[in-house]
Amino acid sequence: MAMKRNPSRVFCAYSKNGTHRSAAPTTHRCIAGGGRGALDAGAENTQGHPESRCFPGGRPPQTGPSWCLGAAFRRAFLIDDAWRPLLEPELANPLTARLLAEYDRRCQTEEVLPPREDVFSWTRYCTPDDVRVVIIGQDPYHHPGQAHGLAFSVRADVPVPPSLRNVLAAVKNCYPDARMSGRGCLEKWARDGVLLLNTTLTVKRGAAASTSKLGWDRFVGGVVRRLAARRPGLVFMLWGAHAQNAIRPDPRQHYVLKFSHPSPLSKVPFGTCQHFLAANRYLETRDIMPITVV
């Protein structure tokens, strides 16, 4: 593709011969590889993509970073292939390209949690066909070292946050004789078929709800709708108004449990919640193995 000299900035990507086009100004940025770094005109672009194009003048179209489609997207976030049928319809939506472009831009200017490899970690613990219970959260913990891609859960070596402490108290209320580990890592739940999914998958360090308008809720909502259509008979635990408004499963097809949020500020003490016991009783009536939460 021929390019004329233009005094304005030119965003260019990988040209056919593997180098930036010499006609580009010396101050331009490359959108290949997620838009990272500026290269001089004619310099070799080692992170380019052979199908990318040069876009003269101003900013490139809102197509998202180069890893936002198909296999490249799954590799960038270490997404398990079993979730591909549920995720790929969202990738075809132009709004997802804008979401990922903004996510990538923010990653270059601020600390975004959890780390990229953990944003979709929930896809790696169980397949869609193994999910039996869905617990909906809001957004990740915003302090470093806490969030690892599972709603409410923290890493094993991190102190248990207040909301999660109340969730564990509810488990103890359902199973008084259970011996609790006292840790807040819920990976065992996830491997056992509990989908712990926030409606917003990222957050700026130290700023709760800072990415709530980014578009993750639309993306996550689409994935949950496809999962619900594919798997009738799921148990949904919706805690608080946010979860109950964000995700609306059909109660004729699923067992929908609602309660106040486990925050210590809630009027109704979450420790009295009987959802875990109710969920297992429901699963047993359908000859489905109950979940193990202790």
UniProtKB/Swiss-Prot annotation:
One of its GO terms (cellular component) is host cell nucleus. One of its GO terms (biological process) is base-excision repair, AP site formation via deaminated base removal. Gene3D superfamilies: Uracil-DNA glycosylase-like domain (3.40.470.10). The active site is at D139 (proton acceptor). Its main location: host cell. It is an enzyme of class 3 (hydrolase). PROSITE patterns: U_DNA_GLYCOSYLASE. Its EC number is 3.2.2.27. It is found in: Host nucleus. It catalyses: Hydrolyzes single-stranded DNA or mismatched double-stranded DNA and polynucleotides, releasing free uracil. It holds the Pfam family UDG. GO terms for molecular function: uracil DNA N-glycosylase activity. Keywords: DNA damage, DNA repair, Host nucleus, Hydrolase. CDD domains: UDG-F1-like (cd10027). Excises uracil residues from the DNA which can arise as a result of misincorporation of dUMP residues by DNA polymerase or deamination of cytosines. Therefore may reduce deleterious uracil incorporation into the viral genome, particularly in terminally differentiated cells which lack DNA repair enzymes. Belongs to the uracil-DNA glycosylase (UDG) superfamily. UNG family. This is Uracil-DNA glycosylase. It comes from Human herpesvirus 2 (strain 333). The gene is UL2.
